[in-house]
Amino acid sequence: MVLIRVLANLLILQLSYAQKSSELVIGGDECNINEHPFLVLVYYDDYQCGGTLLNEEWVLTAAHCNGKDMEIYLGVHSKKVPNKDVQRRVPKEKFFCDSSKTYTKWNKDIMLIRLDRPVRKSAHIAPLSLPSSPPSVGSVCRVMGWGTITSPQVTLPDVPRCANINLLDYEVCRAAYPELPATSRTLCAGILEGGKDSCGGDSGGPLICNGQFQGIVSWGGDPCAQPHEPGLYTNVFDHLDWIKGIIAGNTDVTCPL
């Protein structure tokens, strides 16, 4: 069974103040308040996602995080005790690889959001650069977000959790999920023995490998963090031409096949 890694926002009021679990994303630790100035919190249609600030006007997230009445919060660490520099924005425009907004669990799960007005940089708000080189299997990657820290039961944290996982060969994910095609524009990342993983509510957030922004949280096993069931992440490097083209104003640019 697989899980698209969004989480109903309806649970936030009920669970965001739940007792902290020894399982901290899952299997991680509380992120340092200064290590995620690019991480954004996205609410839509009673759901929660993450995202990444690329510059003062643009956020990159997963296509399956699209919905009505989207709100984007920047500079967030604790949801209970907000930083003084938290900023709220809404989308001005949304861009998808396919004009019909279609995507699959292994293709085109990527969305660019142009914000309604520029973001002001601050102590807790700063963009993350796009990757300058492709990802390498074996890299140590950092995943982060406000998603559930337990699975299948839901326990939402007050502050984002961070975990180190490994970039794995795509064939590892094909073995775990036979429905995957022979090739795709997704990355496979996790811990083979399980215990660390992104999960529900982390969708759209970044996967940072060797210091470079290489992936977008997309989907994975359900429950999360099971042995030999890594997560799938949209490959950012493969979509660089599309991302840069849209930001530059070229709306005719096409996504890779």
Curated annotation (Swiss-Prot):
Residues 1-18 form the signal peptide. The keyword Hydrolase applies. InterPro entries: Peptidase_S1_PA (IPR009003), Peptidase_S1_PA_chymotrypsin (IPR043504), Peptidase_S1A (IPR001314), Trypsin_dom (IPR001254), TRYPSIN_HIS (IPR018114), TRYPSIN_SER (IPR033116). This is Beta-fibrinogenase mucrofibrase-2. Monomer. Negative results: does not have activity on gamma-chains of fibrinogen (FGG). SUPFAM superfamilies: Trypsin-like serine proteases. Belongs to the peptidase S1 family. Snake venom subfamily. Keywords: Disulfide bond, Fibrinogenolytic toxin, Hemostasis impairing toxin, Hydrolase, Protease, Secreted, Serine protease, Signal, Toxin, Zymogen. One of its GO terms (molecular function) is serine-type endopeptidase activity. The lineage of its organism: Eukaryota, Metazoa, Chordata, Craniata, Vertebrata. The active site is at H64 (charge relay system), D109 (charge relay system), S203 (charge relay system). It comes from Protobothrops mucrosquamatus. It comes from the Eukaryota. Expressed by the venom gland.
